[in-house]
Amino acid sequence: MLKTISPLISPELLKVLAEMGHGDEIIFSDAHFPAHSMGPQVIRADGLKVSDLLRAIIPLFELDSYAPPLVMMAAVEGDSLDPTVEARYRDALSLQTPCPEIVRIDRYAFYERAQKAFAIVITGECAKYGNILLKKGVTP
């Protein structure tokens, strides 16, 4: 047992976070995301909300300061976003100061980034457009 590490962070996720280098990306996805067909390592976090995992990992994870470190999927034409999803994520990420802006990219651009990600953490999140990409930075 390690002190000050949230019990929400599985040993597998902790290992992946430690193995990632600066510039590597990790996806925290909703339960509907096609993670297993994307290619990178998939970590299961069934039953957990993305916002809870973000809150747990952000004290351990330095976000990139040279490129946008937070990326979410934009709504498909004719669809709409639920603003409370981004608000929950921003609240969870607020432990990182200053908290960078969240950039939105189109669905297929997000899928391309996911295929190149270091890992995808598939959660129990059911919110529409509930996926977020984090780019790891260099510790100061």
Swiss-Prot record:
GO terms for biological process: fucosylation; L-fucose metabolic process. Substrate binds at D30, R107, Y129, G130, N131. Disulfide bonds: none annotated. InterPro entries: L-fucose_mutarotase, RbsD-like_sf, RbsD/FucU_mutarotase, RbsD_FucU. Its main location: cytoplasm. It is found in: Cytoplasm. GO terms for cellular component: cytoplasm. The keyword Amino-acid biosynthesis does not apply. Keywords: Carbohydrate metabolism, Cytoplasm, Fucose metabolism, Isomerase. It comes from the Bacteria. The active site is at H22. GO terms for molecular function: fucose binding; L-fucose mutarotase activity. Pfam families: RbsD_FucU. Its EC number is 5.1.3.29. Pathway: Carbohydrate metabolism; L-fucose metabolism. Belongs to the RbsD / FucU family. FucU mutarotase subfamily. Involved in the anomeric conversion of L-fucose. PANTHER family: FUCOSE MUTAROTASE (PTHR31690:SF4). This is L-fucose mutarotase. It comes from Citrobacter koseri (strain ATCC BAA-895 / CDC 4225-83 / SGSC4696). The gene is fucU.
